[in-house]
Swiss-Prot record:
CDD domains: GATase1_GMP_Synthase, GMP_synthase_C. InterPro entries: Class_I_gatase-like (IPR029062), GATASE (IPR017926), GMP_synth_C (IPR001674), GMP_synth_GATase (IPR004739), GMP_synthase (IPR022955), GMPS_ATP_PPase_dom (IPR025777), NAD/GMP_synthase (IPR022310), Rossmann-like_a/b/a_fold (IPR014729). This is GMP synthase [glutamine-hydrolyzing]. Residues 13-203 form the Glutamine amidotransferase type-1 domain. Catalyzes the synthesis of GMP from XMP. The gene is guaA. The active site is at C90, H177, E179. Its EC number is 6.3.5.2. Keywords: ATP-binding, Glutamine amidotransferase, GMP biosynthesis, Ligase, Nucleotide-binding, Purine biosynthesis. It is an enzyme of class 6 (ligase). It comes from Listeria monocytogenes serovar 1/2a (strain ATCC BAA-679 / EGD-e). GO terms for cellular component: cytosol. GO terms for molecular function: ATP binding; GMP synthase activity. It catalyses: XMP + L-glutamine + ATP + H2O = GMP + L-glutamate + AMP + diphosphate + 2 H(+). The keyword Nucleotide-binding applies.
Length: 518
């Protein structure tokens, strides 16, 4: 399988080096909020590879290692000599310190949580910010001696050297995590680094992104044909419109009705994308094929792999009926790739767009959105002229309801999730909350409980309502839905959906949980 990669060498950008922190993806997202393109790369990148990327600035992320661990993550030390601004965060600051001859030691007690800092010596990084701030700390080591040529810029009660700077060489380090929202002025600090220190213009927009992508798709595809893995969700729909704008009828959308879609979704997909956008769509009824393969399967990873494989096999079947097809398009997002793991971060769960793909797949893979976060995809959809009904559609995973039915999938369980999810979406819309809640859906855990309905005892299914608020999907908080709305949802589900006698509301944030249950 051959993946088409992007080339943003001409775009001003800040490169984030991944040293394994659970927060490092947030750094990339925050930088983009300032109109500056940013990418995450493994810490193993060489100085030659870094120069080829032509970055405007570099950020060293945090990480779980001690700089003195034998197997600690290191960077190519020549990167420090490139003569461009570098910001080291937490572990990144400690790496910078040891590289330039400073001293790092184990802290007596690991510091984790909110902390008060004092800016001793304001500089370009702290321009316009208060001298006293609340930040988020997460470290087991600390700097006890700054390197020659650096000044101590920030202190805290438990961390006397919480920030260092060499203004002349534009080298900065902070022990805290500005990318985490608990750091009250963290966004402003990162903005100062991007705009003040690195001198970025902040002119990266979805308009120029779409222009670059359309031109790149045209260049890569030429006169060949593309198949799109169309699910009807936001991501694949935006991919479809983007590619259709680039190559028109050279795009054929394969819409697989695998029997794992939401209520009425198959018809809506055909009416909207084929009717309004005049896209070439082949609908494949593969319900029985998928259900046969999933029979008796309970493990979530196995379900994902089966669904991913069957999708590709269906595309292979359809592609064999077409001439000149060389490319397969997918709606893979940056968060999908992140959650599936990088060289330095543990896999959380394999994602449907990056896991389960056969190695001998016959297509070249195009993923135009694989550098974008969800909110950026919505902004791109709006830029492309797509209606709000599509752009603001609830996120829906490629495996569909297959990962919202926990355990073995049956037709009865699918109907329960379809009907309960439809009720949830109706009531959220009736309450005017559809734009306030980032994602909401129902899931069916493999749980039955005792209940009383009418004059009889029941032993039926429990439905979970999941609703979260988020900006980019990297972190999420459970949505504070008004009690009266939750009551309506619960009453309707129990009364209108067969074989359900209990509704529970999931109030777990991400992390520690993921948004989906599987």
């Amino acid at each position: 399988m051959f993946k088409i990669m992007k080339d943003f060498t001409e775009q001003e950008k800040i490169i984030v080096l991944d040293f394994g922190s659970q927060y490092n993806q947030l750094i990339t997202r925050r930088i983009r909020e300032f109109g500056v393109y940013s990418e995450l790369h493994p810490h193993t990148i060489t100085v030659e590879e870094m120069k080829a990327l032509n970055p405007t600035g570099i950020i060293f992320s945090g990480g779980p290692n001690s700089v003195y661990d034998e197997d600690a993550f290191r960077a190519d030390e020549r990167i420090f000599d490139m003569g461009i601004p570098i910001l080291g965060i937490c572990y990144g600051m400690q790496l910078m310190t040891t590289h330039f001859g400073g001293k790092v030691e184990r802290a007596k007690d690991r510091e984790y949580g909110k902390a008060d800092i004092h800016v001793e010596k304001p500089n370009r990084l702290f321009a316009g910010l208060p001298t006293d701030q609340v930040v988020w700390m997460s470290h087991g080591d600390l700097v006890v001696e700054e390197p020659a040529g650096f000044e101590v810029t920030v202190t805290s009660k438990s961390c006397p050297i919480a920030g260092i700077a060499d203004e002349e060489r534009s080298l900065y380090g902070v022990q805290f995590h500005p990318e985490v929202r608990h750091s009250v002025y963290g966004n402003e600090l990162l903005k100062n680094f991007a705009l003040n220190v690195c001198g970025c213009k902040g002119d990266w927009t979805m308009e120029n992104f779409s222009e670059v992508e359309i031109a790149k798709i045209q260049e890569i595809v030429g006169d060949k044909k593309v198949l799109l893995a169309l699910s009807g969700g936001v991501d694949s729909s935006v991919v479809g419109v983007l590619i259709h704008k680039a190559i028109g009828d050279q795009l054929t959308c394969i819409f697989v009705d695998h029997g794992l879609l939401r209520k009425g979704e198959a018809d809506q997909v055909m009416e909207t994308l084929q009717g309004e956008f005049n896209m070439n769509i082949i609908k494949v009824d593969a319900k029985k094929r998928f259900m046969d393969k999933l029979a008796g399967v309970s493990d979530p990873e196995q379900k994902r792999k089966i669904i991913g494989n069957e999708f590709i096999y269906v595309f292979d079947d359809e592609a064999n009926k077409l001439d000149g097809v060389e490319f397969l398009a997918q709606g893979t997002l940056y968060t999908d790739i992140i959650e599936s793991g990088t060289a330095t971060a543990q896999t959380i769960k394999s994602h449907h767009n990056v896991g389960g793909l056969p190695e001998d797949m016959q297509f070249k893979l195009i993923e135009p959105l694989n550098t974008l976060f969800k909110d950026e995809v919505r902004a791109l959809g709006t830029e492309l002229g797509m209606p709000d009904a599509i752009v603001w559609r609830q996120p829906f995973p490629g495996p569909g309801l297959g990962i919202r039915v926990l355990g073995e999938i049956t037709e009865e369980k699918l109907e329960i999730v379809r009907d309960s999810d439809y009720i949830l979406r109706e009531e959220i819309k009736n309450a005017g909350l559809e734009r306030e809640i980032w994602q909401y859906f129902t899931a069916l855990p493999n749980i039955r409980s005792v209940g009383v309905m009418g004059d009889g005892r029941t032993y039926d299914h429990t439905v979970v309502v999941r609703a979260v608020t988020s900006i980019d999907g990297m972190t999420a908080d459970w949505a504070r839905i008004p009690w009266d709305v939750l009551e309506k949802i619960s009453v309707r589900i129990v009364n209108e959906v067969d074989h359900v006698n209990r509704v529970v509301y999931d109030i777990t944030s991400k992390p520690p949980a993921t948004v989906e249950w599987e």
